[in-house]
């Protein structure tokens, strides 16, 4: 590099250091993209911009990557370590292809031809200042590159809203070996790079935004809304103009009013907020979503719903991953001042709880959603329909998902891909309200006062987690499961073919399973699981650390799913972090520390335990079986677990099929044996008295679930002809009674939805016949197996209410073998 150029770069770097604060995507490019800093890297940028080059250089030095300003010297030949695909625009002329890039690619390919050991990494990098998509009808294309004057103002105003996006490398060795080294390959490389950068920019910026009134005019002109307006005028006996005005009013109520400036401002506010409230936001598998966006997919984000914070957190995360914040389906209850107008500008569109009896509303909403897909906007909706009050996934509401498929049946949309997302927190600000609502309190309507009260509670929120699950391409799904789906395409009428409902139900279930597959274990939910497993809600520090280690080893050595994330910290680090959250009490004595979960916190902590209950349910069930039997064969264990697995699978959205269950249980058994929680004697599994305490705590994780199943099965066995409504109601009443008598502090224990799912599963599995009567022989077999795993007191409470005298005289389960006295782990007892 010449001396003058060095001086020029140094002078240019001074204002850039002050004005530019760019974000790197991905956050750790070396590990996430598999870069090898020891091998030569050729940086490829879209067009000639010294500001972009110096911004890239600053990030490369921060990431310990080679300096793009230092040339590469290979086999005595010195070549630049960066290349611009285009020359870039000048103030008075638009850009033209820069042939130097083709020549440089050709020179590098030639070096590979002459040196078989050489393998240069070609690393595409784009630097963006600002993310405004622009408005439709404006003459300047939003994908334009900037000339020198425009770049100056972009850096001045948007230097702190910039990012450096590293892409996956291309091996020049592979290119040379597979495609040759002549000039046509160099031309092809340059052409592919141009397409890559164009797609990448579109994925980051999104399509142009329409003027709101222009959008309404287009919707009004659609055949479906024209027909709905005519029907509205006829059915309500009003004029066509009045019916049309009703449609416009509904559009005003529904439609977002997306503003890039609002997003940019909210990013500043949220960055400040997250940094003060949270100790970190952990994001996993975002690269798969970036790739989908770059490949031109229409993305529908379907996260679980824990808190009102979800809306803001997910948009914030996506924005910082270099993606366009989505249009978000929000409940109409959030459309209050000032939140409603703010959310609208951040991309929210509002949806009523029910569409029943309002054909015009359902048509307008469906057409608006279809228009979002047609224009290429990403969309987000919560498939559960509302926030989970228990910490578990709710049964999915399929209305919006059904409309998504109906949008495909209009024809003409890009490929739609559903992206399940797990959102987790170490502290949910509404958890106290949830507990009150589950105890019968009436849900407060959202308003400004409630929002301000909630903001007052925002402190010490620990860590947040956003895990992107395995994407579900709709076209691929329909091609596999409904090959004839294209026969139903109709651009005017909303179609409801016979296959739609079963397909939507299956898709919804798959989404929930994939959300659970991407669950995040953390300090709070692991500590809550251990302490709630102790009847006294307290453990010594040593016992709690031992139990945390048991959970961590299970999750690491026998992982639930490839997308599940487990903390990489030690049990000591996790416990110290949890104690800093001020949810637990520590009582010190001369022997050591006792960690206590206070009574008033116990119900709240079940929320966090329930977030990961599905990860530990099968190990807990194995532990429970071994605890009771003391000695059991693998075959017998598999048989017993297989009887109740369909209920667990439906309730907790587990991903193992019946065919996968034996292998899964073997893997878990091997891990429990490795931890010496049980002894594997080949054909038999035997209790290990020396490790009974952690086994006992592990077994407690499934205790309440089995008791709930026993309640319903005992009622079915006692009254085989009981109808579904009565069965669910009686089960809930008995569960409430059991929770009072035996101190069960879990609100979901008598949750209506849980019993509804259980009864539906019993019918599907053949425990209830087509006539509606229970098959007593089957229900008694499962009940006897379950009741044997419960304490005599709990069993007596259930049977005293549900089982008639003659049923109680049925042959009993084998008598519980004597077990050594295994006192509860030491800790503070309840007063």
UniProtKB/Swiss-Prot annotation:
A motif (HXXXXD motif) lies at residues 304-309. Keywords: Acyltransferase, Cell inner membrane, Cell membrane, Lipid biosynthesis, Lipid metabolism, Membrane, Phospholipid biosynthesis, Phospholipid metabolism, Transferase. It catalyses: sn-glycerol 3-phosphate + an acyl-CoA = a 1-acyl-sn-glycero-3-phosphate + CoA. It is a peripheral membrane protein. Its EC number is 2.3.1.15. It comes from the Bacteria. It is an enzyme of class 2 (transferase). GO terms for biological process: CDP-diacylglycerol biosynthetic process; fatty acid metabolic process. Pfam families: Acyltransferase, GPAT_C. Residues 801-831 are annotated as: Disordered. Transmembrane segments: none annotated. GO terms for cellular component: plasma membrane. CDD domains: LPLAT_DHAPAT-like (cd07993). NCBIfam families: plsB, PRK04974.1. The HXXXXD motif is essential for acyltransferase activity and may constitute the binding site for the phosphate moiety of the glycerol-3-phosphate. HAMAP family: Glyc3P_acyltrans (MF_00393). Belongs to the GPAT/DAPAT family. This is Glycerol-3-phosphate acyltransferase. It comes from Yersinia pseudotuberculosis serotype IB (strain PB1/+). The lineage of its organism: Bacteria, Pseudomonadati, Pseudomonadota, Gammaproteobacteria, Enterobacterales. The gene is plsB.
């Amino acid at each position: 590099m010449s001396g003058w150029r060095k001086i020029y770069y140094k002078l240019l770097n001074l204002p850039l250091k002050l004005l530019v604060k760019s974000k790197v995507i991905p956050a750790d490019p070396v590990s996430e993209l598999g870069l090898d800093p020891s091998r030569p890297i050729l940086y490829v940028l879209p067009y000639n911009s010294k500001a972009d080059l110096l911004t890239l250089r600053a990030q490369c030095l921060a990431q310990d990557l080679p300096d793009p300003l230092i040339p590469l010297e290979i086999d005595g030949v010195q070549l630049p370590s960066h290349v611009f695909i285009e020359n870039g625009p000048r103030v008075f002329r638009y850009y033209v292809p820069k042939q130097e890039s083709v020549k440089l690619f050709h020179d590098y390919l030639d070096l590979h031809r002459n040196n078989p050991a050489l393998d240069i990494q070609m690393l595409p990098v784009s630097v963006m200042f600002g993310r405004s998509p622009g408005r439709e009808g404006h003459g300047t294309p939003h994908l334009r590159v900037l000339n020198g004057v425009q770049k100056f103002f972009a850096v001045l105003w948007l230097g702190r809203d910039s990012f450096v996006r590293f892409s996956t490398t291309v091996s020049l060795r592979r290119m040379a070996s597979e495609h040759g080294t002549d000039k046509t390959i160099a031309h092809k490389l340059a052409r592919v790079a141009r397409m890559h950068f164009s797609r990448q920019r579109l994925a980051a910026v999104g399509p142009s935004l329409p003027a709101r009134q222009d959008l309404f005019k287009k919707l009004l002109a659609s055949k479906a809304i024209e027909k709905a307006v005519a029907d509205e005028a006829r059915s309500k006996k009003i004029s066509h103009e009045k019916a049309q005005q009703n449609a416009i009013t509904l559009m005003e109520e529904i439609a977002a009013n997306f503003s890039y400036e609002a997003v940019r401002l909210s990013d500043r506010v949220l960055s400040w907020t997250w940094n003060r409230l949270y100790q970190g936001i952990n994001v996993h598998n975002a690269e798969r979503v970036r790739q989908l966006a770059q490949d031109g997919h229409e993305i529908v984000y379907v996260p679980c719903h824990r808190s009102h914070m979800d809306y803001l957190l997910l948009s914030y995360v996506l924005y910082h991953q270099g993606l366009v914040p989505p249009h978000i389906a929000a409940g109409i209850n959030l459309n209050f001042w000032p939140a409603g107008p703010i959310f609208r500008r951040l991309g929210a569109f509002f949806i009523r709880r029910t569409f029943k009896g309002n054909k015009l509303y359902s048509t307008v909403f469906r057409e608006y959603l279809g228009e979002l897909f047609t224009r290429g906007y990403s969309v987000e909706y919560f498939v559960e329909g509302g926030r989970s009050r228990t910490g578990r996934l709710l049964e999915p509401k399929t209305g919006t998902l059904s409309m998504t498929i109906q949008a495909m049946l209009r024809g003409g949309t890009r490929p739609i891909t559903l992206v399940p997302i797990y959102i987790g927190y170490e502290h949910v600000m509404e958890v106290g309200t949830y507990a009150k609502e589950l105890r019968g309190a009436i849900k407060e309507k959202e308003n400004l006062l409630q929002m301000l009260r909630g903001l007052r509670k925002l402190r010490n929120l620990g860590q947040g987690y956003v895990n992107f699950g395995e994407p579900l391409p709709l076209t691929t799904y329909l091609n596999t499961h409904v090959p004839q789906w294209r026969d139903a395409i109709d651009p005017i009428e909303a179609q409801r073919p016979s296959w739609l409902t079963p397909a939507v139900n299956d898709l919804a279930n798959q989404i929930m399973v994939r959300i659970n597959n991407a669950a995040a274990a953390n300090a709070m939910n692991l500590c809550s699981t251990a302490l709630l497993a102790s009847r006294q809600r307290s453990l010594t520090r040593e016992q709690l650390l031992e139990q945390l280690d048991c959970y961590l080893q299970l999750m690491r050595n026998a992982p639930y799913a490839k997308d599940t994330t487990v903390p990489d910290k030690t049990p000591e680090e996790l416990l110290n972090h949890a104690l800093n959250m001020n949810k637990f009490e520590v009582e010190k004595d001369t022997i050591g520390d006792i960690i206590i979960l206070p009574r008033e916190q116990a119900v709240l902590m079940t929320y966090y335990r329930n977030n990961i209950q599905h990860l530990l349910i099968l190990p807990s069930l194995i532990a429970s079986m071994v605890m009771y039997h003391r000695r059991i064969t693998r075959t017998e264990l598999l048989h017993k677990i297989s009887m109740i697995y369909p209920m667990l699978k439906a309730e907790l959205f587990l991903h193992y099929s019946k065919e996968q269950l034996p292998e899964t249980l073997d893997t878990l058994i091997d891990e429990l044996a490795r931890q010496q929680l049980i002894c594997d004697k080949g054909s038999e599994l035997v209790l290990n008295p020396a490790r009974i305490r952690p086994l006992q705590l592990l077994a407690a994780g499934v205790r309440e679930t089995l008791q709930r199943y026993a309640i319903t099965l005992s009622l079915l066995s006692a009254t085989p002809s009981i109808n579904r409504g009565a069965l669910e109601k009686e089960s809930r009443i008995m569960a409430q009674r059991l929770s009072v008598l035996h101190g069960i502090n879990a609100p979901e224990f008598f949750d209506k939805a849980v019993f509804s799912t259980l009864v539906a599963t019993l019918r599907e599995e053949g425990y209830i016949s087509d006539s509606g009567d229970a098959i007593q022989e089957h229900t008694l077999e499962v009940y006897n197996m379950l009741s044997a795993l419960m304490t005599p007191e709990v069993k007596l409470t259930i049977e005293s209410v549900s089982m008639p005298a003659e049923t109680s005289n049925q042959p009993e389960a084998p008598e519980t073998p004597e077990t050594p006295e295994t006192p509860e782990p030491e800790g503070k007892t309840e007063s």
